Amino acid sequence: VLTRIKVSADDPAFLEPEKFIGPVYSPEEQMALEATYGWHMKRDGKYLRRVVASPAPRQIIESAAIELLLKEGHVVICSGGGGVPVAGEGEGVEAVIDKDLAAALLAEQIAADGLIILTDADAVYEHWGTPQQRAIRQASPDELAPFAKADGAMGPKVTAVSGYVKRCGKPAWIGALSRIDDTLAGRAGTCICL
C-alpha cells in the first residue's frame, strides 16, 4: 500500500534539515544545486550530500484501509521507508520520515497487539562495543531512555518503541530478523513494556 503520512508543515525539523538523501556531490556541484534548486547540503565524509527534514509523523492517511486489509487476512506491506510525507491538504513535502516512528504510529493507529522492530542487531545493548557489553532482554521505556540518544541506528528504534509502549500500554520488541521467533519468546532481542 502506497502510504501517505501526514506531517506538520510547521515542524521544527524543516528549519534544520539533517537526513542525507541521494548521491554525493563535489563543492562545485553543491553551489550550482543550492542556487538552482534551493537544496541544503552537508558534508558526508569528503563529499557533500543533500539533506532534507525529518519531521515527526502525525497521521497515516491509509491506516483504515490497512486495518481492513489485515482484518480480511491479507499480508500488507506498507509505510515503506517511512512512507510518503504530505502536509496541509495532502501536498507532498520534501522530507524523510523515520521508518521506525512511522511503524510505531501505524501500530498505534490500527490498534496492533504489539510492535516489533527488526534489525541486524540482536538486541539493545548496554556498554555496546566494549568488553562489558550486555544484551538488555527486558526494560521499560524509562529504563531505555538513555539509549534513545545513542548515535547510529539504535537510537531512533528505541525512541519509536518507547513512545509506542508509553502511548498504547502494549509491548514492543527490538531484535534481529533472523531471530524473530526467539525475540518474541524472550530468548533474544529486547522486550520493552510497562
Task: Name every feature range the model reports, one short phrase each.
Residues 1-194:
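C-terminal catalytic "cap/lid" subdomain
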